[in-house]
Amino acid sequence: TFIDVDCTVSKECWAPCKAAFGVDRGKCMGKKCKCYV
C-alpha cells in the first residue's frame, strides 16, 4: 500500500508505515513509501 510520504531510502518509510498501519515494514519505491500490510 502506497502512502503519501516522500523518501529516498526504505528506512525512511518504517516510522510512517508504523504510524499509518501499525507495521514497520515497507520500502521506498519511485520516491514514495510503500507499506506491506
UniProtKB/Swiss-Prot annotation:
SUPFAM superfamilies: Scorpion toxin-like
Entry comment describing in which tissues the protein is expressed: Expressed by the venom gland.
Subcellular location(s) of the protein: Secreted
Positions of the record's site feature: Aromatic residue of the functional dyad: Y36
Cellular component annotations (GO), alphabetically ordered: extracellular region
Keyword Secreted: yes
Disulfide bond sites: C7-C28, C13-C33, C17-C35
PROSITE patterns membership: SCORP_SHORT_TOXIN
Keyword field contains Protease: no
Keyword line: Calcium-activated potassium channel impairing toxin, Disulfide bond, Ion channel impairing toxin, Neurotoxin, Potassium channel impairing toxin, Secreted, Toxin
One of the record's GO molecular function terms: toxin activity
Main location: secreted
One Pfam family linked to the record: Toxin_2
Domain of life: Eukaryota
Annotated site, Basic residue of the functional dyad, chain positions: K27
Additional remark text: Negative results: does not inhibit other potassium channels such as dSlo, Kv1.1/KCNA1, Kv11.1/KCNH2/ERG1, Kir2.2/KCNJ12, Shaker-IR, and voltage-independent/calcium-activated SK1/KCNN1, SK2/KCNN2 and SK3/KCNN3.
Protein family (similarity comment): Belongs to the short scorpion toxin superfamily. Potassium channel inhibitor family. Alpha-KTx 01 subfamily.
Domain notes: Has the structural arrangement of an alpha-helix connected to antiparallel beta-sheets by disulfide bonds (CS-alpha/beta).
Biological function: Reversibly blocks the high conductance calcium-activated potassium channels composed of only alpha subunits (KCa1.1/KCNMA1). Unreversibly blocks the high conductance calcium-activated potassium channels composed of alpha and beta1 subunits (KCNMA1 and KCNMB1). Unreversibly and weakly blocks the high conductance calcium-activated potassium channels composed of alpha and beta4 (KCNMA1 and KCNMB4).
The protein's name: Potassium channel toxin alpha-KTx 1.11
Organism from which the protein derives: Centruroides noxius (Mexican scorpion)
High-level lineage: Eukaryota, Metazoa, Ecdysozoa, Arthropoda, Chelicerata
